[in-house]
From Swiss-Prot:
Gene encoding the protein: dnaK2
Role of this protein: Acts as a chaperone.
Keyword annotations: ATP-binding, Chaperone, Nucleotide-binding, Phosphoprotein, Stress response
Full protein name: Chaperone protein DnaK2
Protein's GO biological process: chaperone cofactor-dependent protein refolding; protein refolding
Amino acid sequence: MGKVVGIDLGTTNSCVAVMEGGKPTVIANAEGFRTTPSVVGYAKNGDRLVGQIAKRQAVMNPGNTFYSVKRFIGRKFDEITNEATEVAYSVVKDGNGNVKLDCPAQGKQFAPEEISAQVLRKLVDDASKYLGETVTQAVITVPAYFNDSQRQATKDAGKIAGIEVLRIINEPTAASLAYGLDKKDNETILVFDLGGGTFDVSILEVGEGVFEVLATSGDTHLGGDDFDKKIVDFLAGEFQKAEGIDLRKDKQALQRLTEAAEKAKIELSGVSQTEINLPFITATQDGPKHLDTTLSRAKFEEICSDLIDRCGIPVENAIRDAKIDKSALDEIVLVGGSTRIPAVQEVVKKILGKDPNQGVNPDEVVAVGAAIQGGVLSGEVKDILLLDVSPLSLGVETLGGVMTKIIPRNTTIPTKKSETFSTAVDGQSNVEIHVLQGEREMANDNKSLGTFRLDGIPPAPRGVPQIEVTFDIDANGILNVTAKDRGTGKEQSISITGASTLPDTEVDRMVKEAESNAAADKERREKIDRKNQADSLVYQAEKQITELGDKVPAADKIKAEGLIKDLKEAVAQEDDAKIQTVMPELQQVLYSIGSNMYQQAGAEAGVGAPGAGPEAGTSSGGGDDVIDAEFSEPEK
């Protein structure tokens, strides 16, 4: 089994790690950074850009640069109406109600899974270069509060990227693995994970290699992006009051505002106020307009007060579900870049009555934990037992539109549970099973994971047939449902239809497209490399001919200059076929010139040339040929 990497696929940034010599190592990307922006851009010339290079060009190319895509993955369009308006690119609904991201540069629409797959592909490629071997297997983390659809969609993204996803693991659980790997004493810890787009709280018992999740809670609509949005709205509102222009309606201005807001938020974690300067943010008939203001930490905390208050709700819920007292918590572990916000740290301290532990790197700890789990699955790490839970209740819709729970939230996984149901009317020959996930009493208020039918039930009075419905959650937290007529033994077993927004045929198409794109990308890279080599060869040829001057035979010089001219034209016209033809010809001429020069030098040296015969030079061996010489020491 090859190396299994651990990947934290984040909303804002992603990170990859691996076990080396029994210790987890975070792998730097090709640009030298330990985290990679979860950003994918498509340039007008068709080039696909991923990571830092994509983020850098976002202001100039907002409509084709995709970020915060994790907030859309595995969701229907009706679930993301607010988030869809907060990004500079176009988020649209397809004919099935699924989310699509419009890309004018490519003339097509992407599923969120396709964009996430590009980020995963870069992380795995960078890991492969670091390890010196091809990486094909990974453990990928997801927010603990991700539902079944979002988990399946994340797994699909891995498949599109050409990765075998061995395990989907919850982010707070991964963080606890990294925190507690070397801990011998038993501890009860609370992991407070506030990332770029999601928020999770998990309470675990950790010690002697056992990591047991007692309870988890969260909010998949709360993260650093929301804090950025508050700053954007504040700045845009103030500008609109002064100038009468809403900057949020201009995609380029919105992108600049978003980047400035993120920068200001980060700076306010260390200083009490920060300057925000955006020259030429827009223009009117009167000329260009500039945004120049100061934002204080106090004002930032004021405009984000509702978000900070929301951080407390999942904490209280998790403590209640774990059935423990706050005083029983030994450590509070902060995870995610947004936990650097002082007001967030203060609310944690206020609710739990103790200072949080800041001994882990909030940007890397989740990937480190995923790498440890990868080590467990590959057999490299021994004596670790991970007991995670299902974050939300699972059940079916029953008579009257009620949700009947089969697996309550915070049930340890993997798990399998069954309930027996019957028909609602006389002579009913089939039943429709509507699978739900959530905590509300009525079916319509919960997340619909899909429906399926069990046919062929023999006619009987209502209440007589016995239909056994079995829910089976695997270690990834992904659900399979089976319905069986106990009278006839007929069975219908499915992986939830609708659990993923992408059908298998669509995923397979995207996998093939990604593979063909990978080949095209490789070919494009090879062309660029050849062009660069040709540039370098032209420079070397011109330099060599100039330096050698008259030593170059006239015929060779004329031939070389002609080939240099041809190669320059091929490079300027990006004629790859011509480059491949001319470059070896020029190299051969240069070899010939170099060879002739050395032969000429040897001929001019005559008998004194090295190796010119037995009488050439002086012998260093013993015998009469030794020449004794006396040297006078210079006067000092």
